[in-house]
């Protein structure tokens, strides 16, 4: 309306790097000749690209408002020189940014250690070792940062199993309730004699069998009955019969394996890993998270005499996590596990960055 289009004398824009194109157009509509725009931002701290924020607008602003003065605040008062120097080298690889010289306003006194691992299991084990023997008050100054909270579940379970106190600021999906964990446990339950219809409806097509729900018309699954169902008209299907026979044989094999070998057999013998690859599609990070849970299950089952004891231990751990609650529990003392997004503006004496692998950090779709 006429009132909103009336020129503003002054306009202050904060967190300019998080501005999207629509917001920028509104700014230009509000600002007319004779006004003063004061925009504050740091394109190196842009974290809202998922909702349309475009830090490139800061460069557009400089081109469209050629008379604007630019003041670069290049001194960092939060981090020691060692961290600022290493960070600046990494950030400088981004060519689509406002060039700036970064320095530290603090005395030297820190270090950055780059440590490589064969895989995620070894990486997590290293951090657990660094936490052993520390008091909750000492761990309060530690933080482990992940790119997304979907990657935290396995580490959360390992911290709890190791008796290491931890604090979460976000809701973490429990690894014990994850569909991958449920599927693996269901395969074992079926191998050890469970014939509940609902269980088989969950695993029947993971991987896909040429068997339909119509053959599971009883609360208790009977393989002989299913074979007969597909051996006679009108549902005669020799391929389905072969699938059922093969599935039954694999369950018998699974029941004879140790737990650890059994998980490997589920992954490859049943083709569950291939099923996860198809389900994840092009989402590489999602697949890696799922495969990490399978790796963790192989670790977690070790030391348990049989499936019944392992299942009971998992149920107890799941209850403990549920009782402690996840997300927003900031009163207890312990190591902090959180996403990089949630860590913005916070300070810790020792920080572990997880999964610093090409394609994960930064995410391959973000570059």
Q: Where are the model-predicted features located?
A:
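Conserved helicase NTPase motor core
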Residues: 1-59, 75, 79, 337, ...
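Helical mechanochemical/support elements of P-loop NTPase systems and associated helical scaffolds
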Residues: 12, 36, 54-57, 76-82, ...
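Short glycine-/polar-rich loops that comprise or flank the Walker A/P-loop
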Residues: 33-36, 42-44, 65-70, 108-112, ...
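Conserved nucleotide-binding/hydrolysis micro-motifs of P-loop NTPases
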Residues: 43-47, 52-56, 76-80, 121, ...
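ATPase/helicase motor core of nucleic-acid motors
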Residues: 64, 108-110, 135-259
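Helicase P-loop NTPase motor core
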Residues: 66-69, 74-165, 191-193, 255-256
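A short beta-strand element within the Helicase C-terminal
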Residues: 182-186, 336-364
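Accessory C-terminal helicase-associated subdomains
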Residues: 232-342, 363-365
